[in-house]
Amino acid sequence: MSYNLLALVQQVTSELNLAIPTYVAGNPSQDVQQILALMNRAGYDLVKEYDWQALEVEYRFYTTAVTTTCDTTNGTYILGNIPSTVGLDSTYSIVGTNVPQDTYVDTVVDAHTITTTQLSSATSVGGSVTFSKTIYDLPPDYETITDNTHWDKTKHWQMLGPVDAQQWQWLKSGYISTGPRVRWRILGNEFQIWPPYNTQEYLGFEYRSRGFVKHATGQVKNSFTADTDTTVLDDTVMVLATKLKYFQIKSFDTTALNQDYIRYLNVAKANDKGSATLSFAPQPSAVLIGWANIPDTGYGS
């Protein structure tokens, strides 16, 4: 079981021959406040240092889409007479009668009316329209994405990406903008997909969390704030990193502390998760989705 924040700080102060505190959060001692800040800094640095298995998280979510009807007026931004606009916002793409490609909800005017980001190309009454959410929030503890883990679990297809800016605009603006495979990119700190779904799909990917701290109730946190908080990272690494940073900030000689820290950090990395067994006669790598496993008939069905 991991030490809590109080125990970690007490270990640091004991090893540095400083006054050992009885509490950390709210402690007026400048040394305690500084050690708390440095321990958080050590955590932030360690998050970026390595793909710790304790910080690797699977993220899953369902896409949202609704097909309904609306009225359009040529040359205006207004879609009216929608049965309900509940839940719609600017993260929804619009595909429908007289609605140009790559059009999004701009504002929700009332329970039956919205404005869009592009002008309607013609006038119609009761035309079909699909509102599809293509922009999704990243998890609150998101640090970085894990490559090649993005899947449409409903269709059992890997999602393609990250798409660069030029490809993205080509997909959203070109004549051929849709296909059976979903593309993705991270834009504006949001997870975006294309083309828009017209049905609910189950998507997922893995990411590295920056939540190296856990509240006593199990809630993931990005910093130590309470004495009962624990870390999912190695306690000894946290103690050694904090001691090293304390000496650095005081302009003390850090040679010995740095050697101890690097030595133990390398051990912690080596022991953090298993490694693949390497063969002197390896077989071809596993095929994901390609020509080798696309059926001759019934493609996409």
Segment roles from a protein language model:
Residues M1-T73, V86-P100, Y104-T107, A111-S120, ...:
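Glycine-enriched, solvent-exposed interface loops adjoining structured elements
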Residues G75-P83:
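Short alpha-helix capping/helix-loop boundary micro-motifs
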